[in-house]
Amino acid sequence: MKIEAVVFDWAGTTVDYGCFAPLEVFMKIFHKRGVEITAEEARKPMGLLKIDHIRVLTEMPRISNEWKHVFGQLPTEEDIHEMYEEFEEILFAILPYYATPIDGVKEVVSSLRERGIKIGSTTGYTREMMDIVAKEAEIQGYKPDFLVTPNDVPAGRPYPWMCYKNAMELCVYPMNHMIKIGDTVSDMKEGRNAGMWTVGVILGSSELGLTEEEVENMDPLELREKIEVVRNRFIENGAHFTIETMQELENVIEHIEKQELIIS
């Protein structure tokens, strides 16, 4: 078994430690309408196409009930599109500041390329958003061989289409010769649905939701508990492997190749 390509997620996996760029924007657009949502609620759908993310938030029972209390009715598609337009406007302005590669990513990608492994990527951001993020990340030294956004395929995560398009453009087949790595539940489902080896990265992830400073200063036992919660969540949603940092990815690749594992 030879791993020929790795498909990385972006925010929370390769850039934007903790995936904070969209978080406060989601909270802000609801707050503006008198509906308060928590950071935990805002993170739950992370990884989806952003308009789908907003739609899922409006469908959460507590949020939909609070919306109904404020407006006397449940959110409509018009409300969702209106919030999405505001979301885009705010996010576009801040995205350049959230495109810094996470520590270790550039070195791991360079090492993978030395092994002949191709580098693909998928995202929950739109093409317009990624034009900003990818440009800034490239300036800072990170550029995958290929990028697919939900705009390029019939549907985003958890559907496998973005991974399939990466496979076609990178000329890799069968799908079990590829790894999908990400930091959200939707990443795990995307990779599994595509028939790929699926890896969840924990530190820096949206699922963990901590800044680098918080990780460094947290009580080790408390941090370990939080890490294990995320690890279990990834496994429950299809991850074949979990890693705490990107530097562990090559160990996973060697394990798959040496053990000649078969996707179950």
Swiss-Prot record:
It catalyses: phosphonoacetaldehyde + H2O = acetaldehyde + phosphate + H(+). Binds 1 Mg(2+) ion per subunit. GO terms for molecular function: magnesium ion binding; phosphoglycolate phosphatase activity; phosphonoacetaldehyde hydrolase activity. It comes from the Bacteria. One of its GO terms (biological process) is DNA repair. The keyword Oxidoreductase does not apply. Its EC number is 3.11.1.1. The keyword tRNA processing does not apply. Keywords: Hydrolase, Magnesium, Metal-binding, Schiff base. GO terms for cellular component: cytosol. The active site is at D9, K50. It is an enzyme of class 3 (hydrolase). Belongs to the HAD-like hydrolase superfamily. PhnX family. Homodimer. Involved in phosphonate degradation. This is Phosphonoacetaldehyde hydrolase. It comes from Bacillus mycoides (strain KBAB4).
